């Protein structure tokens, strides 16, 4: 899911056609509307859950755990902290399955209430993925569960990060708009020195329909061997000779896998008419050359974009806190 908290959404920008404050049901509906997300998760559940003991961590309305029951899981534990969703999970399981008498399922508030026996669960499921790949503290908590069940199948078991260069018409429109703006923002810190024209900080975006991009691997976050240290330095290098001349924006995106099966992504290669409930993040830096880092707190989801000036010094282009209110 994206980083929703306390049943409302901040004012960073329109989520889709429906703006304003969101209830927890709106958040769940937004995930259900992401067809590609559902297809990937369902494919993995069909492949791995039959006859298995399953935990669905961050269960929401119970969508994934119920689908596991429908596909032959013998036992499912739903872990969802929002107790107002528990009746929905119960009813969803009731109306969607004529389950065998041997099938068992449980609904609980947190992971302390699930069986603590090592390797009790054979499949660990969580849509513990946010806009930046990491979903607040949820991904970290899922990592704790997977450590207790090292022989389990994890859906997903890793997040792979990429950067790609693209041409975004909106960037050029913004530059022209700011140059024509009646108040001079262009020369804030000297001639043509401004953070606004173009905006050179990391920012949220929702790019789709870029089918011919080159995906450049940044790093992999292993969800079965989750980092115990809070910060991970995901470094990558840009070389302007490898970026097409007309490209004006770097988009950062990710893919999630279970073994060799890709199940989730927020790639700009998605069809332009598809609905993607995740944002991407990206930036524009004049010259597109140098060493960068997604300096990430993998316990909280806080991500900074750094640009390294040399080996001993670094410059923060912008640090973004991806948490909501």
Which residues make up each language-model segment?
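Class I SAM-binding transferase module
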Residues: 2-57, 62-325
């Amino acid at each position: 899911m994206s980083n929703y908290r306390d049943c409302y959404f901040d004012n960073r920008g329109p989520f889709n056609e429906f703006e304003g404050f969101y209830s927890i049901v709106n958040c769940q509906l937004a995930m259900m509307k992401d067809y590609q997300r559902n297809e990937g998760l369902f494919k993995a559940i069909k492949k791995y859950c039959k006859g298995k003991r399953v935990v669905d961590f961050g269960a929401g309305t119970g969508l994934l755990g119920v689908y596991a029951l429908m596909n032959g899981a013998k036992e499912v534990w739903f872990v969802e902290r929002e107790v107002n969703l528990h009746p929905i999970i119960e009813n969803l399981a009731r109306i969607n399955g004529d389950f065998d008498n041997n099938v068992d399922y449980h609904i609980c508030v947190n992971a302390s209430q699930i069986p603590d026996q090592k390797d009790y669960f054979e499949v660990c499921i969580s849509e513990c993925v946010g806009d930046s790949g990491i979903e607040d503290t949820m991904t970290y908590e899922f990592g704790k569960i997977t450590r207790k069940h090292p022989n389990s199948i994890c859906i997903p078991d890793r997040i792979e990060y990429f950067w790609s260069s693209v041409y975004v018409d909106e960037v050029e429109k913004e530059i022209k708009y700011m140059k024509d703006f009646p108040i001079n923002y262009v020369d804030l810190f000297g001639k043509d020195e401004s953070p606004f024209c173009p905006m050179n900080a990391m920012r949220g975006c929702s790019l789709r329909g870029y089918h011919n991009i080159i995906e450049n691997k940044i790093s992999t976050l292993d969800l079965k061997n989750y980092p115990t240290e809070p910060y991970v330095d995901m470094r990558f290098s840009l070389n302007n000779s490898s970026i097409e001349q007309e490209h004006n924006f770097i988009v950062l995106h990710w893919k999630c896998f279970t073994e060799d099966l890709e199940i989730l992504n927020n790639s700009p290669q998605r069809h332009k008419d598809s609905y993607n409930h995740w944002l991407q993040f990206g930036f524009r830096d004049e010259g597109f050359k140098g060493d960068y880092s997604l300096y990430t707190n993998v316990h909280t989801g806080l991500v900074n974009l750094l640009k390294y000036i040399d080996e001993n010094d670094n410059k923060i282009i912008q640090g973004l806190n991806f948490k909501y209110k």
